[in-house]
Amino acid sequence: FFMDQTNKMKYFLIILCLSLQMSIFAQNTMMVVGHRGCRGVMPENTIEGFREAIKRGVDGIEWDVVVNNQGQLVISHEPYFHKDFCFDPQGNPIEDETRYNIYRMSQMQIKGFDCGTKFHKGFPEQQKIKASKPLLKEVINMVPEIRSKRIFFEIKSDEPEYGISQPFPEYYASLILNEVSRYKLRSIRYMSFDKNILEELHKLDPTLNLVYLSEKKGIKKSLKELSFKPNSVGLYYRTINKRTVNILRDLDIGIYAWTVNQIEDGHKMMSFAIDGIITDYPRRIIEARSTYSSKPKRFRH
């Protein structure tokens, strides 16, 4: 009887140790993704910003894509020039953003805008350098190390803007896949808030790794908007809680949190054992990850 109890205790301790190791492994291997490159310290979505993010040790890079009037993919968070980040070609502040529709501009025109020297109070540590919105192909050619990183490829798309500041989804999706096929990239996750562009990508290639972005609470309702199960969701970090994580784990859907910039918020996300954190300050979150430890969770991965 006592031998049987001893064996049971040994078995329990082995399982407990393995669970603890798996939990720590999951936390230490959680991806840290540079948001728009490394925008806490460098201008967003610029070649210089992507280089800095890689230098700081990110596991992945997040960038945003729009289209110019030549059908080329441009790295930009908006399909126009944001007044908070850019100066016009004459060096003047931008007042009416709608005047500068990237979808109606050539890349030569786009290059004339300076989106790197304007001070932004939200990012006081950001280094000021003259920088323009690059083409996707320029980033890949000028930052070759990026090919080995996981790419979080956010497609800027909004239904009211179809045909105005962007192509319609069917053409947009084929344009993206045709261009990306020219490059040898290690791993791409296509992301969007627009379900229609994700649907078109899924139709063209059901094997694509697709991430549905959402800033709303109630993830089950959001997922019902899609005709397929996405590989992952990208959620505003304040909407993530244990219940949300458990629902997504039961559905075998990955979870990425955006945009997490404070150590305490990073630790909270790590306690949920999610798949990755998207951050403006990669070094800060990488350091937080390296020092974090907690009790084992119930999550499978």
Roles of regions detected by a PLM:
Residues 11-20:
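Sec-dependent N-terminal signal peptides
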Residues 23:
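Predominantly soluble domains enriched in secretory-pathway, periplasmic, or organellar proteins
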Residues 26-301:
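Phosphate-group recognition and catalysis centered on beta-loop-alpha active-site segments
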Residues 4-12:
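Positively charged n-region of N-terminal signal peptides that target proteins for export
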